[in-house]
């Protein structure tokens, strides 16, 4: 079977301060920074995975990074996107309520067919009331978008949004990632929602064991 390199443009969208840039930094190199200086302008992060058929799946991830209020620039970021990952702070009702506006603006540029993933970030925070999935779906008017609770701080479920999108783009619902090219497998911390995710972790562990020693 011929191995391929597949490339997709993905937008990270949501209010400022919900953890978009922190999340993508976590995916790229395992780094978590609670405090950082927001980047001015769009930033394109290449995020690469290897699947179980040897294909390289590359996501060109566009982070709006501090430009959320500049409507003209947002259109430029969205054009040509294959899909989007929307973020909100699971402890902040206003960031959840704003999801509907973000989705509407994205779909006005890209259309309604591009797949969408919704991420409730900061699920690790203790002693604060968290927004329920039911409320999120009410805000999004019952749209059946894929939904994940994640933590950029602990890396909880941080790869599942990309895994879900890869399955849609390739038409392979059983696709698994055998490695995150950007990060050592030992950094992965998943909540196993299905046999497929469990199988993914098994592959990651095997890949780690087979890696040559320095």
Swiss-Prot record:
Tell me the superkingdom of the source. Answer: Eukaryota
- Molecular function via GO: GTP binding; GTPase activity
Entry's localization field? Nucleus
User: In its keyword annotation, does this UniProt entry include Ribonucleoprotein?
Assistant: no
Q: Is Transport tagged as a keyword?
A: yes
Q: Name one GO biological process term.
A: ribosomal subunit export from nucleus
The entry's keywords: GTP-binding, Nucleotide-binding, Nucleus, Protein transport, Transport
Q: Where is this region: Switch-I?
A: 34-42
For this protein, the record's SUPFAM superfamilies field holds: P-loop containing nucleoside triphosphate hydrolases
Q: Which residues form the Small GTPase Ran-type domain?
A: 4-172
Q: Which InterPro entries match?
A: P-loop_NTPase (IPR027417), Ran_GTPase (IPR002041), Small_GTP-bd (IPR005225), Small_GTPase (IPR001806)
* Cellular component terms (Gene Ontology): cytoplasm; nucleus
List of residues binding GTP: 17-22, 66, 121-124, 151-153
Q: Which residues form a coiled coil?
A: none
Describe the protein's quaternary organization and the partners it interacts with.
Answer: Found in a nuclear export complex with RanGTP, exportin and pre-miRNA.
Q: What does the UniProt record say this protein does?
A: GTP-binding protein involved in nucleocytoplasmic transport. Required for the import of protein into the nucleus and also for RNA export.
PANTHER family attached to this UniProt entry: GTP-BINDING NUCLEAR PROTEIN RAN, RAN GTPASE
Which family does the similarity line name?
Belongs to the small GTPase superfamily. Ran family.
What this protein is called in its record is: GTP-binding nuclear protein GSP1
The source organism is Encephalitozoon cuniculi (strain GB-M1)
Primary gene name: GSP1
């Amino acid at each position: 079977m011929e191995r391929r390199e597949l490339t997709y443009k993905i937008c990270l969208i949501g209010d400022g301060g919900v953890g978009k840039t922190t999340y993508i930094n976590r995916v790229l190199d395992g780094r978590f920074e609670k405090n950082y200086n927001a980047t001015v302008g769009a930033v394109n992060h290449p995020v690469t995975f290897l699947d179980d058929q040897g294909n390289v799946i590359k996501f060109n991830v566009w982070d709006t990074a501090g430009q959320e209020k500049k409507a003209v620039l947002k259109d430029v970021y969205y054009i040509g996107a294959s899909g989007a990952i929307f973020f909100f702070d699971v402890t902040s009702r206003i960031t959840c309520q704003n999801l509907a506006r973000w989705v509407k603006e994205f779909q006005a540029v890209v259309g309604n067919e591009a797949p969408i993933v919704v991420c409730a970030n900061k699920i690790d925070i203790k002693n604060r009331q968290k927004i329920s999935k039911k409320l999120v779906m009410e805000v999004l008017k019952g749209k059946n978008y894929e939904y994940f609770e994640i933590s950029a701080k602990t890396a909880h479920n941080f790869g599942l949004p990309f895994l879900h999108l890869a399955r849609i783009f390739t038409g392979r619902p059983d696709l698994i990632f055998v490695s995150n090219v950007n990060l050592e497998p030992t950094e992965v911390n998943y909540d196993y929602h299905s046999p497929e995710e469990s199988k993914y972790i098994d592959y990651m562990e095997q890949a780690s064991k087979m890696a040559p020693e320095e």
